[in-house]
Swiss-Prot record:
Name of the protein: Protocadherin alpha-4
Transmembrane segments: 698-718
UniProt gene name: PCDHA4
Bridged cysteine pairs (disulfide): C96-C102
SUPFAM superfamilies per UniProt: Cadherin-like
UniProt topological domain (Extracellular) ranges: 30-697
Subunit annotation: Forms homodimers in trans (molecules expressed by two different cells). Forms promiscuous heterodimers in cis (at the plasma membrane of the same cell) with other protocadherins. Interacts with FYN.
Functional summary from the UniProt entry: Calcium-dependent cell-adhesion protein involved in cells self-recognition and non-self discrimination. Thereby, it is involved in the establishment and maintenance of specific neuronal connections in the brain.
Record note on domains: Cadherin 1 to cadherin 4 domains mediate homophilic trans-interaction, the interaction with an identical protocadherin expressed by a neighboring cell. This is a head-to-tail interaction, the cadherin 1 domain interacting with the cadherin 4 domain and the cadherin 2 domain interacting the cadherin 3 domain of the other protocadherin. The cadherin 6 domain mediates promiscuous interactions with protocadherins on the same cell membrane. Each cadherin domain binds three calcium ions.
Topology in the lipid bilayer: Single-pass type I membrane protein
Upper taxonomic lineage: Eukaryota, Metazoa, Chordata, Craniata, Vertebrata
Subcellular localization, as worded in the UniProt entry: Cell membrane
Source organism (scientific name): Pan troglodytes (Chimpanzee)
């Protein structure tokens, strides 16, 4: 054969066409090989690994394997060189019977990732089977009266091969009576017969021996023979004849037994017994046909007597002969072709080829989970199978190859929502009614650490009494993780920071597994009121996830500090205070004031004063204010009173149990002409206006100098602390001593170790500077007042009832407070907040300075809030100082008191916020009212209480 190439352009087109065909087959995922049947073991078939595009080194790691349907082991792959070879004997006739096409279908499966390739190996036929006749000898009885050209059917030979190897040619041994009629193209293979060419003469030749030879088309040719023994009969001249020589019938599979297939009819021109016909199956039909069908010998009806299955056989060929009853019976023949029609009687078959389980919850979309193979033995629409999946699941089925589906991930997974899926795959054919089959698979979702531990709330408030034993359990934190196994194993730890000069871990610890929080040392309310820190919960996943929770531990106060006496300004030996009192003083004259502080808070720091009875039961003309500590006279003094008195004042707090301290005051009675101590509260004798003015100026200068000095000192100290403080958040340190505020109606005692003691992790505490200016007339007004003896009082201004102390001012207040209504403790996210109502009355108490105690024990005075209700405090006269003013930047209130001669000064408290309106109002007073106001001042000796 010669090939003549045209132009170069045609060559390129042909080459491009071949490349496109190769690429199409490669993309289709199929390979085609061919091998001859009966090939020896080890015969080379093809380089399958190379043709699939796989490297030899990855065959074993990717679990390269070959699977075939039905018959395994015929072909195998050498994993060392990737060659497909013959492993065992291949017999095409056994494998495919007489099918025109015979292939071995292989499935090549590799993992990581999962891939499936289809390989078809065509089995080529070789001429290894000779033609075979049903019998080696056939006997024929032919009447001598048969006319010429009579036809006598013969059973042809069969060849197990196909194609040209099964293409048979027949030849008859030479004779003068018969010739061989070969089948034409439009007839079936078995249309072979003898044609009578010369009349028979029984007397001349009673028997005729012929040999029929069948030769196939293979190379080399193979032959088969059958001996024909023809017996010449005498008499009956007419044989039965059927209406048609070939009948074709369609029959549904699965029809019940007794179903009529066809009714045959044959006729015989003879009469009598020679014309009676008996129907029967030819002896040449297979036993399988005889087991499926039955023919009635009289009527010629063929009925079903066995199970007809389309999948077993698609058609049946039945040879029927009609024989008359003549002495020399004659026969006629016909063929019945029964074509079986398919019925949808087979359910689809499902099989999971490969599973990749469990699947991670973070698997990307499109991940292949399983490979599903479906098949149906029916044909046509009845064998067309479609698959469906359970609805409302994050998976879908994707058709990959013919009768193959891939189960892939369609949407994101969340193990915390659904940890496993029960999937049901339904395969349904296209028949009517449709048949279906199901297969289920459980898909477990593997956990991924995608959930951090979560606390029930972002922060907790814990209350712990001070002086707790070391190692006591104060709280338990608990976090929950929605993940599983190690990803849900939660451990707890502290977020380390510094509290003052010490590490947080020296105060508290947390158990890593249980989350229990322990106090490692006794807590001191006076040192640390609030300890704020964070606890971290972290799981054991990779990478680990964590979250924090804030704990606010409030240290509750206990009465563990006794009242402490403050040194008197005049001093006294042995802790005793000495006072000189004129004999001429009247009732309620203030002799001295006992000052005490308590480091505790609330009721534990609320102090009361009691005067111990004198020795021998003698009555003494003095009393002490229950809450003010002021010692005053109960009556006018006379000669019966002792000139010296030793007073014992018991200072007691309101804790449980109460703690006490005792102060000693030595009172000496002197004549009016003797000068009393400067510390005395009362001035004896009448002092003129000039002397009073001098005293006022002296006290004013002292106060201004003290305030200025304290302000400068506070600013310097604050600057030094800010510069030297370590850059730690939430540091706490003991504060500096504070001052004491006192008046005739009560005493406010402040801890000597106080600073804002609330520790948190949000930054250093803020410093609130609040300036309270005393309501004093300016220098110009004072000069005008020195030139006149008339004084005027301005109208009293009421403080703002909504005013509150600042945070730094409240943090330093730890003493008894002049209040009469109950306080309310409210616990919020930032800690307890106590509000104390105001004093509702400014009437002097029956006993100097006594007030009703606040309701509720254990209240933290650091969070007291003072309200000043409506009242009528008296305005300070000219040259007088207000009772109190507050040093900026300090929680202390300074008491400055000036008493005119023979009278008791008014006790009015003034708190202003930088406003200097009092002096302006004094200028606007009319001079006509000065005389009347002076008279009212002289007659008024009543003290007003703080509002």
């Amino acid at each position: 054969m010669e090939f003549s190439w045209g132009s170069g352009q045609e060559s390129r087109r042909l080459l491009l066409l071949l490349l496109l065909l190769s690429a199409w087959e490669a993309g289709n995922g199929q390979l085609h090989y061919s091998v001859s049947e009966e090939a020896k073991h080890g015969t080379f078939v093809g380089r399958i690994a190379q043709d699939l595009g796989l490297e030899l080194a990855e065959l074993v790691p990717r679990l390269f394997r070959v699977a075939s349907k039905g018959r395994g082991g015929l072909l195998e792959v050498n994993l060392q060189n990737g060659i497909l070879f013959v492993n065992s004997r291949i017999d095409r006739e056994e494998l495919c019977r007489r099918s025109a096409e015979c292939s071995i279908h292989l499935e090549v499966i590799v993992d990581r990732p999962l891939q499936v390739f289809h390989v078809d190996v065509e089995v080529r036929d070789i001429n290894d089977n000779p033609p075979v006749f049903p019998a080696t000898q056939k006997n024929l009885s032919i009447a001598e009266s048969r006319p010429l050209d009579s036809r006598f059917p013969l059973e042809g030979a069969s060849d197990a091969d196909i194609g040209e190897n099964a293409l048979l040619t027949y030849r008859l041994s030479p004779n003068e009576y018969f010739s061989l009629e070969k089948p034409s193209d439009d007839e079936l293979v078995k249309g072979l017969g003898l044609i009578l060419r010369k009349s028979l003469d029984r007397e001349e030749a009673p028997e005729i021996f012929l040999v029929l030879t069948a030769t196939d088309g293979g190379k080399p040719e193979l032959t088969g023979t059958v001996q024909l023994l023809i017996t010449v009969l005498d008499a009956n001249d007419n044989a039965p004849a059927f209406d048609r020589t070939i009948y074709k019938v369609r029959l549904l599979e699965n029809v019940p037994n007794g179903t009529l297939v066809i009714k045959l009819n044959a006729s015989d021109l003879d009469e009598g017994l020679n014309g009676d016909i008996i129907y029967s199956f030819s002896n040449d039909i297979s036993p399988n046909v005889k087991s499926k069908f039955h023919i009635d010998p009289i009527t010629g009806q063929i009925i079903v007597k066995g199970y007809i299955d389309f999948e077993e056989s698609k058609s049946y060929e039945i040879i029927v002969e009609g024989i008359d009853k003549g002495q020399l019976p004659l026969s006629g023949h016909c063929r019945v072709i029964v074509e079986v029609e398919d019925n949808n009687d087979n359910v689809p078959d499902l099989e999971f080829k490969s599973l990749s389980l469990p699947i991670r919850e973070d698997a990307p979309l499109g991940t292949v989970i399983a490979l599903i193979s479906v098949s149906d033995k029916d044909m046509g629409v009845n064998g067309l199978v479609t698959c469906s999946l359970t609805s409302h699941v994050p998976f879908k089925l994707v058709s990959t190859f013919k009768n193959y589906y891939s189960l892939v991930l369609d949407s994101a997974l969340d193990r915390e929502s659904v940890s496993a899926y029960e999937l049901v795959v339904t395969a349904r054919d296209g028949g009517s009614p449709s048949l279906w089959a199901t297969a289920s698979v459980s898909v477990e979702v593997a956990d991924v650490n995608d959930n951090a531990p979560a606390f029930a709330q972002p922060e907790y408030t814990v209350f712990v009494k001070e002086n707790n034993p070391p190692g006591c359990h104060i709280f338990t934190v608990s976090a929950w993780d929605a993940d599983a196994q190690e990803n849900a194993l939660v451990s707890y730890s502290l977020v380390e920071r510094r509290v003052g000069e010490r590490a947080l871990s020296s105060y508290v610890s947390v158990h890593a597994e249980s989350g229990k929080v322990y106090a490692l040392q006794p807590l001191d309310h006076e040192e640390l009121e609030l300890l704020q820190f964070q606890v971290t919960a972290r799981d054991a996943g990779v990478p680990p996830l964590g979250s924090n929770v804030t704990l606010q531990v409030f240290v509750l106060d206990e009465n563990d500090n006794a009242p402490a006496l403050l040194a008197h300004r005049a001093g006294g030996t042995g802790g005793a205070v000495s006072e000189l009192v004129p004999w001429s003083v009247g009732v309620d004259h203030v002799v001295a004031k006992v000052r005490a502080v308590d480091a505790d808070s609330g009721y534990n720091a609320w102090l009361s004063y009691e005067l111990q009875p004198g020795t021998g039961g003698a009555r003494i003309p003095f009393r002490v204010g229950l809450y003010t500590g002021e010692i005053s006279t109960t009556r006018a003094l006379d000669e019966t009173d002792a000139p010296r008195h030793r007073l014992l004042v018991l200072v007691k707090d309101h804790g449980e149990p109460a703690l006490t301290a005792t102060a000693t005051v030595l009172v000496s009675l002197v004549e009016s002409g003797q000068a009393p101590k400067a510390s005395s509260r009362a001035l004896v004798g009448a002092v003129g206006p000039d002397a009073a003015l001098v005293d006022v100026n002296v006290y004013l200068i002292i106060a201004i100098c003290a305030v200025s000095s304290l302000l400068v000192l506070t600013l310097l100290l604050y600057t030094a602390l800010r510069c030297s403080a370590p850059p730690t958040e939430g540091a706490c340190a003991p504060g500096k001593p504070t001052l004491v505020c006192s008046s005739a109606v009560g005493s406010w005692s402040y801890s000597q170790q106080r600073r804002p003691r609330v520790c948190s992790g949000e930054g250093p505490p803020k410093t609130d500077l609040m300036a309270f200016s005393p309501s004093l007339p300016d220098s110009r007004d004072r000069e005008d007042e020195l030139q006149t003896t008339e004084e005027s009082f301005a109208k009293p201004r009421q403080p703002n009832p909504d005013w509150r102390y600042s945070a730094s001012l409240r943090a330093g207040m730890h003493s008894s407070v002049h209040l009469e209504e109950a306080g309310i403790l409210r616990a919020g996210p930032g800690g307890p907040d106590q509000q104390w109502p105001t004093v509702s009355s400014a009437t002097p108490e029956p006993e100097a300075g006594e007030v009703s105690p606040p309701v509720g024990a254990g209240v933290n005075s650091n969070s007291w809030t003072f309200k000043y209700g409506p009242g009528n405090p008296k305005q300070s006269g000219p040259g007088e100082l207000p009772d109190k003013f507050i040093i900026p930047g300090s929680p202390a209130i300074i008491s400055i008191r000036q008493e005119p001669a023979n009278s008791q000064i008014d006790k009015s408290d003034f708190i202003t916020f930088g406003k200097k309106e009092e002096t302006k109002k004094k200028k606007k007073k009319k001079k006509g009212n000065k005389t009347q106001e002076k008279k009212e001042k002289g007659n008024s000796t009543t003290d007003n209480s703080d509002q």
